[in-house]
Structure formats: C-alpha cells, structure tokens
C-alpha cells in the first residue's frame, strides 16, 4: 500500500509518501509544493493543484490522507484553508483516489503515543519510525509524513481510521501499548 499524506496550506503544502509492504514502511518521497508567492489566492490554489497532480503522477499512491480541518481564532485564515483543502480534495477525487481524514490528536497519538504532542515531538519521532537519518524540514513535510504514517499504522489503510474504534474511543492504552506496537524503537 502506498499512501500520500498531505498537509495543505495556501503558501506551502507539505507532502509525504510512505509505502508499506510486508509490515515494513519506507519513505518514497516528501517535500513541499510552493505556489508563487506573488500570485493571488486563486492562482496559488491552481498552482497547488497542478503540483499535487504531478506528485500523484510520479509517486502513484493508492490513497491520500489529510488532517481534518482545524478551526482557529482567525476566521479569515480558516476560510482560506477551507478553500485550499477543498481544492486538494477535488483534485484527489478527480484522479479517482480514496481520501481519508484524521484528527490532529489521532495523528499525534499514532506517531508519538500521545495525542497532546507538539509538532516538534512528531518530527523527532518520525525518523525512528521510518528509518530516516533525520527529520525532513520544514514541519509541513514532517506533518504530511505523520499523516501518511497514521493512515498506515495499525492497519488503518484497511480500516479507514487511525487508532480509533468504531465507537470513537481510542484503542491505545498509553505508552505500554505504543511500546508493544513499536519494539524496534527500544534501545
């Protein structure tokens, strides 16, 4: 299974592609899609969609994973992000790929073992989980890899959820369950 994780933004969009085969994960690629800073929002969204289509054509993912929409205090920013997310979803759906969405807490829980982790904690954990020498930069890229990892973790690519049961309750039992699920991280 090959999953493309996408962390959408109007100025830069992170992406990360992870393949899972026989229980082993490998990063196929990751980076940023950066529309021209001088363009209007509509032009940047168009460039983002073109860049995303190129990533999908090159990496050939079987599914795409996104973080659910986050609504902060800035209404204008939330509206812009909503437009960007809508364009990303439309692009992916147009190309016939399934889309799965995960709450930020689900992603953090899958990567670090705690849903309250900071972005930097997610970034520092991913190299250990994915066999990387160091965490890719910037955080938009590690966020995208974390989203893809969440989708692939614990069979999520087959069940459509990350660490959650149908009732919405976490399957995690805390650090003990995380350590049991990731013995390769023990020194």
UniProtKB/Swiss-Prot annotation:
Active site (UniProt): 7, 67, 140
Give the species this sequence originates from.
Answer: Chlorobaculum parvum (strain DSM 263 / NCIMB 8327)
Say which enzyme class the record assigns. hydrolase
Q: Give the subcellular location.
A: Cytoplasm
Q: How does it assemble?
A: Homodimer which binds Holliday junction (HJ) DNA. The HJ becomes 2-fold symmetrical on binding to RuvC with unstacked arms; it has a different conformation from HJ DNA in complex with RuvA. In the full resolvosome a probable DNA-RuvA(4)-RuvB(12)-RuvC(2) complex forms which resolves the HJ.
One term under GO cellular component: Holliday junction resolvase complex
* Signal sequence segment: none
Kindly list the positions annotated as binding Mg(2+) 1: 7, 140
An example Gene Ontology molecular-function term: DNA binding
Q: Which UniProt keywords apply?
A: Cytoplasm, DNA damage, DNA recombination, DNA repair, DNA-binding, Endonuclease, Hydrolase, Magnesium, Metal-binding, Nuclease
Under catalytic activity, the entry for this protein gives:
Endonucleolytic cleavage at a junction such as a reciprocal single-stranded crossover between two homologous DNA duplexes (Holliday junction)
Task: List cofactor names only.
Answer: Mg(2+)
- Pfam families recorded: RuvC (PF02075)
Cofactor mode of binding and number, as noted: Binds 2 Mg(2+) ion per subunit.
For this chain, the family text in UniProt reads:
Belongs to the RuvC family.
**What is the name listed in the Swiss-Prot or TrEMBL entry for this protein?**
Crossover junction endodeoxyribonuclease RuvC
What GO terms describe the biological role, i.e. biological process, of this protein? DNA recombination; DNA repair
- What EC designation does it have? 3.1.21.10
Q: Which residues form a coiled coil?
A: none
**What's this protein's function?**
The RuvA-RuvB-RuvC complex processes Holliday junction (HJ) DNA during genetic recombination and DNA repair. Endonuclease that resolves HJ intermediates. Cleaves cruciform DNA by making single-stranded nicks across the HJ at symmetrical positions within the homologous arms, yielding a 5'-phosphate and a 3'-hydroxyl group; requires a central core of homology in the junction. The consensus cleavage sequence is 5'-(A/T)TT(C/G)-3'. Cleavage occurs on the 3'-side of the TT dinucleotide at the point of strand exchange.
Positions bound to Mg(2+) 2: 67
